[in-house]
Amino acid sequence: MGDKPIWEQIGSSFIQHYYQLFDNDRTQLGAIYIDASCLTWEGQQFQGKAAIVEKLSSLPFQKIQHSITAQDHQPTPDSCIISMVVGQLKADEDPIMGFHQMFLLKNINDAWVCTNDMFRLALHNFG
């Protein structure tokens, strides 16, 4: 991993940590958000750590597992990192579904936090 740019190392580590928390104990996700963080979940907007954790903790499944297909990371001009994830998830006994998620990471007091998070299931309407 040492030959990858630092933003890829940080982004990859964050992604691994995020989905491990999400799949095992969503209530712990508050540690990666701040009060100014924003989440867009399937088009619904949530602002602030408390609202985000409440939303993620109240999702209507008991068990979930994410499988990451690809992840891309870029540095931003203001020293943040933008990360995009494409993968699949399986919730309870539901069929496997694709998803896309984007994170904007910012270093605050020597810790990387998520200031912006956007999630969508990869569902398509052909009409």
Swiss-Prot record:
<feature type="modified residue" description="N6-acetyllysine">
    <location>
        <position position="4"/>
    </location>
</feature>
<keyword id="KW-0811">Translocation</keyword>
<dbReference type="GO" id="GO:0006611">
    <property type="term" value="P:protein export from nucleus"/>
</dbReference>
<keyword id="KW-0963">Cytoplasm</keyword>
<dbReference type="Pfam" id="PF02136">
    <property type="entry name" value="NTF2"/>
</dbReference>
<dbReference type="InterPro" id="IPR045875">
    <property type="entry name" value="NTF2"/>
</dbReference>
<dbReference type="GO" id="GO:0005654">
    <property type="term" value="C:nucleoplasm"/>
</dbReference>
<dbReference type="GO" id="GO:0031965">
    <property type="term" value="C:nuclear membrane"/>
</dbReference>
<keyword id="KW-0007">Acetylation</keyword>
<keyword id="KW-0509">mRNA transport</keyword>
<comment type="subunit">
    <text>Homodimer. Interacts with RAN (GDP-bound form); the interaction is direct and regulates RAN nuclear import. Interacts with the nucleoporins NUP54, NUP58 and NUP62 (via FG repeats); recruits NUTF2 to the nuclear pore complex a step required for NUTF2-mediated GDP-bound RAN nuclear import. Interacts with CAPG; mediates its nuclear import.</text>
</comment>
<comment type="function">
    <text>Mediates the import of GDP-bound RAN from the cytoplasm into the nucleus which is essential for the function of RAN in cargo receptor-mediated nucleocytoplasmic transport. Thereby, plays indirectly a more general role in cargo receptor-mediated nucleocytoplasmic transport. Interacts with GDP-bound RAN in the cytosol, recruits it to the nuclear pore complex via its interaction with nucleoporins and promotes its nuclear import.</text>
</comment>
<dbReference type="GO" id="GO:0005640">
    <property type="term" value="C:nuclear outer membrane"/>
</dbReference>
<dbReference type="GO" id="GO:0042802">
    <property type="term" value="F:identical protein binding"/>
</dbReference>
<protein>
    <recommendedName>
        <fullName>Nuclear transport factor 2</fullName>
    </recommendedName>
</protein>
<dbReference type="GO" id="GO:0051028">
    <property type="term" value="P:mRNA transport"/>
</dbReference>
<dbReference type="InterPro" id="IPR032710">
    <property type="entry name" value="NTF2-like_dom_sf"/>
</dbReference>
<dbReference type="GO" id="GO:0061608">
    <property type="term" value="F:nuclear import signal receptor activity"/>
</dbReference>
<dbReference type="GO" id="GO:0005829">
    <property type="term" value="C:cytosol"/>
</dbReference>
<dbReference type="GO" id="GO:0031267">
    <property type="term" value="F:small GTPase binding"/>
</dbReference>
<dbReference type="GO" id="GO:0017056">
    <property type="term" value="F:structural constituent of nuclear pore"/>
</dbReference>
<dbReference type="InterPro" id="IPR002075">
    <property type="entry name" value="NTF2_dom"/>
</dbReference>
<feature type="domain" description="NTF2">
    <location>
        <begin position="10"/>
        <end position="121"/>
    </location>
</feature>
<dbReference type="GO" id="GO:1904046">
    <property type="term" value="P:negative regulation of vascular endothelial growth factor production"/>
</dbReference>
<keyword id="KW-0653">Protein transport</keyword>
<keyword id="KW-0906">Nuclear pore complex</keyword>
<dbReference type="GO" id="GO:0090204">
    <property type="term" value="P:protein localization to nuclear pore"/>
</dbReference>
<keyword id="KW-0539">Nucleus</keyword>
<keyword id="KW-0472">Membrane</keyword>
<dbReference type="GO" id="GO:0044613">
    <property type="term" value="C:nuclear pore central transport channel"/>
</dbReference>
<dbReference type="GO" id="GO:0006606">
    <property type="term" value="P:protein import into nucleus"/>
</dbReference>
<keyword id="KW-0813">Transport</keyword>
<dbReference type="GO" id="GO:0042307">
    <property type="term" value="P:positive regulation of protein import into nucleus"/>
</dbReference>
<dbReference type="InterPro" id="IPR018222">
    <property type="entry name" value="Nuclear_transport_factor_2_euk"/>
</dbReference>
<dbReference type="GO" id="GO:0005637">
    <property type="term" value="C:nuclear inner membrane"/>
</dbReference>
